[in-house]
Amino acid sequence: VKSNDGRIDPQGTCIGMRGSRVNAVSNELNGERIDVVLWSPETAQFVINALSPAEVSRILIDEDNHSVDVIVTEDQLALAIGRGGQNVRLAADLTGWQLNIMTIEEADERHEAEDSVIRNVFVAHLNVDEATADLLVQEGFATLEEVAYVPANELLEIEGFDESTVEI
């Protein structure tokens, strides 16, 4: 739900006093459970709202694959996923995005594995040692093309880089 009037609480209005409105609709639907979710034009906020009451720690949006990595603490994992995956499935249907729920530890492991792959590519193709490849990864470089198109003077600004490193 959404309201264009900032003075109105759209969720509270739909739910009613002590749930009277939503209970009336639920009774009409033979006791079907109803969630009232606050709509947002921003994907990250809409996903957070759709997974409520689970508390989301971080969100990583992958526009290319139309997926969202939702990172939660260990104690929030079961709440975010729901019984039999029901919560995450409903949130994915509602938002139109593929949702991947993971713990902070799983996200860190995944990030480290991705960094390791990038680091190995840099070592293999740029003829640099692992320490230099680590510096490139820490600076946010993810592809060979990104490194190739950065002016030499910008690479020299990276701590630990000198002219001999940049020439490689």
Task: Give short role names for the model-derived ranges.
Residues 1-168:
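RNA-contacting regions in translation and RNA-metabolism proteins
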